[in-house]
Amino acid sequence: MNTTVISILTTISISFFALNASGQTYPGKALQLQMQKEETAFLANMKPGLQHTQMLAVRDAMKGDYSALDQIRQSRNQAPVLPETVETKYITPDICLFSPVNATERKRPLLLYLHGGGWCFGSINSCARFCAALAEAGDCCVAALNYRLAPKYTFPMPLNDCIEAFEYLKQHAEEWGCDSSRISIGGDSAGGNLALAASMSLTGVHKVIPIYPVIKLFTEVTSSWKEYAQGYGDDAELLAAFNEAYSSGDSHNPLVSVGLASDETLTELPPVLIISAGHDILFDQTAEFARRLQRLGHPLSYHVFPTATHLFITVPGQPAAFQESVRIVSRFLNE
């Protein structure tokens, strides 16, 4: 029996029908329209030239000048207000545990979460809203990691940090009331890439949850690459700078460009949940990756928000996509 479950908010292209081997679900039109309304407002409020400025900062840092990149990192590292129903605790200097305050006798699932930011910026604070929302909605624990950032720390150093964090969580999960046999890895954008690469490198990962992940760190001019190359949350020139800063000339390594992993490697992954934004430069490469998992008969749940754009996990402004992601991921972690 094919274990692939595809959830698509609307039919975006004929290519997706090939994925629908075991059925589709369609949320109501109201949610689709709400996501579209929020995306329009989000993009209208985006500061003109922001991503070009970020690209220049990354390029300068690659040449040794970190002044502009450090300013961007500081501006994106503001601690958000979190619900009182969730406790936060640093269990190491670089890992913050988000857990529900209410007591429970059951062992909770645990998610290692890896923030986005093109491997060059981002932090625990970037993803804290999402981690706290997951902990509350899913009655689970979420451990967010500050992995080392490019371009100072290139592949494989950030990936090694993620692998070591998982091993640490595995050793200590029971101390926090978590189930050491149900530790999953997730992340958004660059963090989704790291989640997949770490899951390919480890044994014992329960599930893997990449959200609008970077699948290939080299340019392939697809329809989404052309249509959403500018003005949609992750411009092509910025993505190219991110890719070069992290890969450091090793972009075709399958632990860097996870879409190049062998069939054997992919079939050894744990069950996969992918969430994609339809208006995203990364959309086509993620869809191709999902189709490949489907052809291999791999356990896959693939959700597309066709009227959302990149960044809805870490940057406020697309609450419907954010909340729907919380609902989907929470359910997946507890299945």
Language model regions located:
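Bacterial Sec-dependent N-terminal signal peptides
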Residues: M1-T25
